[in-house]
Amino acid sequence: RDAYPADWRGCKPSCPWGSSSWCNEECTSLGGSSGYCAWPACWCYGLPDSVRYYNNKCHK
């Protein structure tokens, strides 16, 4: 699945100042194929279904 991964609160991880290499490492460490900084958060490609993803309920 292509999505924003979510942290334990269901929120998107912010990318530090547009760092696509940092996001790529985060995404691949979660089992995704790659990722980039879609500021202000990391967008991942090919995440496994077991990974939590952002569902627009952060801070609600």
Curated annotation (Swiss-Prot):
Domain LCN-type CS-alpha/beta: 1-59
Listed InterPro entries: LCN-type_CS_alpha_beta_dom, Scorpion_toxin-like, Scorpion_toxin-like_sf, Scorpion_toxinL, Scorpion_toxinL/defensin
GO MF annotation terms: sodium channel inhibitor activity; toxin activity
Keywords: Disulfide bond, Ion channel impairing toxin, Neurotoxin, Secreted, Toxin, Voltage-gated sodium channel impairing toxin
GO-annotated biological processes: defense response
Disulfide bonds: C11-C58, C15-C37, C23-C42, C27-C44
Any one Gene Ontology cellular component term annotated for this protein: extracellular region
Keyword Disulfide bond in record: yes
SMART domains: Knot1
Pfam families to which the protein is assigned, alphabetical: Toxin_3
Known tissue expression: Expressed by the venom gland.
Cell location: Secreted
Keyword Disulfide bond on entry: yes
Domain notes: Has the structural arrangement of an alpha-helix connected to antiparallel beta-sheets by disulfide bonds (CS-alpha/beta).
Family: Belongs to the long (4 C-C) scorpion toxin superfamily. Sodium channel inhibitor family. Beta subfamily.
Role this protein plays: Inhibits the sodium currents (Nav) in an apparent irreversible manner. Produces small depolarization and induces repetitive firing in squid axons. Is specific for arthropods (crickets, triatomides, crabs and squids), but is non-toxic to mice.
Name the record gives this protein: Toxin TdNa2
Organism name: Tityus discrepans (Venezuelan scorpion)
Lineage per the UniProt record: Eukaryota, Metazoa, Ecdysozoa, Arthropoda, Chelicerata
